[in-house]
Amino acid sequence: MAKKIQSYIKLQVSAGAANPSPPIGPALGQKGVNIMEFCKLFNKKTENIEKGLPIPVIITVYSDRSFTFITKTPPASVLLKKLSGIKKGSSKNKSEKIGKINRSQIKEIAIIKNNDMTGSNIENMMRSIEGTAKSMGLIIEG
């Protein structure tokens, strides 16, 4: 018989840097999950990813206090900032352009995010990422 699901916890945790401090500790502690076990497993799973990249994770907590988790790819905005070399998006995206990104870089992000996005093909995913880039104040070239 399948285990009974108690709850889901959604967090963004830096790759390879999970530790029991907030937000991980309080979120898992109130559900009775072994925090150190999660931190060890998460850090092991994300050891090949660039340290510091925020990784969305969905933790399924079962009624016997055991858990499983799924890691996703970093948010598109984080990948766009990394590839365009900017620190943060523009607060006035219509009038203030703060960086440039080309279509080949957008395609690279779409390929990385392929499993997490709900696009039927790469072109549709690229359009979605272009929208994110425009809202951040990036100019799309090519």
Swiss-Prot record:
CDD domains noted in UniProt: Ribosomal_L11
UniProt KW keywords: Methylation, Ribonucleoprotein, Ribosomal protein, RNA-binding, rRNA-binding
Name under which the protein is recorded: Large ribosomal subunit protein uL11
Keyword Ribosomal protein applies: yes
Post-translational modifications: One or more lysine residues are methylated.
GO cellular component, one term: cytosolic large ribosomal subunit
Subunit comment: Part of the ribosomal stalk of the 50S ribosomal subunit. Interacts with L10 and the large rRNA to form the base of the stalk. L10 forms an elongated spine to which L12 dimers bind in a sequential fashion forming a multimeric L10(L12)X complex.
Organismal lineage: Bacteria, Pseudomonadati, Pseudomonadota, Gammaproteobacteria, Enterobacterales
